[in-house]
Amino acid sequence: MPPVAVAAYTATSALGRGVAAQLEALQAQRSGLRANDFGPHVDGAPLPCFIGRVDGLEDAALPAEFAQWECRNNRLAWMALDTDGMAQAVADAIALHGAERVAVVVGTSTSSIGASEEAYARLDGDGDEARFPDDLARPIVHTVHSLGDFLAHATGARGPCITVATACSSSAKVFAQGARLIEAGLADAVLVGGVDTLCGSVLYGFNALQLVSRERCMPFDVRRVGLSLGEAGGFALLRRAQPGDVLQLAGYGESSDAHHMSAPHPQGLGAQRSMADALAEVKRDLGQDA
């Protein structure tokens, strides 16, 4: 594939806001997990588990001009966009290439479903007359594309706008999609990334699958008993590579083994193929035999 540069990047998670906060926490071996203090609660008590919750979202309302997109997920998107100079990097790309040549490709698993949960919990009326409360009667929020639509309006990008929703792979696939848009000549720069926030559907859905650990998760440990859920938002700006670029997208691979609705192939064939295809692409770009 033609060289694609990563011109800017940022991340916000339970570890903190911005790349520096993530690095500091990793170097200090500090976890972002804490005892679950996020609703909705069953019988007055939260689900007994550990979560990675981003502090400050409850007080980080969107600017008034974006009120129709107001929800926890878009709040985190706005917070992440306003970190590490990401919003300015997108603005610079628009100034250089034009708004129609800057695309948005973002991934999300549940998007703004937390707002939909609240709307159903607060229905006005009964039976066939039940309606969402006025403050949540905003159709643009109750769709998986809420994130992509919000970011396009928030940044002013007017190129292709795509929201990828393929569960846990969503925010990885956007790099491949963004690179293809540039390769096809449909965009000169692409804002890629992903945002997912805590909500009842995620917490209780994974718990129903018996996948949520009651203790802090222990990835790769023989004693592991499940996962811990959290929320985070991260973005990168892709563009055609130029001399002197430090960071480039070396390659990507995608597959779908279609083994099971919620479980991978026992031998991980889908993941194997994706990684093999990505490595083969890197070798081709380096002029080596795949």
What are these regions (language model features)?
Residues 108-162:
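Active-site-proximal gating segment of KS-fold condensing enzymes and close homologs
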Residues 15, 20-106, 112-113, 274-289:
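Conserved active-site "lid/cap" helical segment
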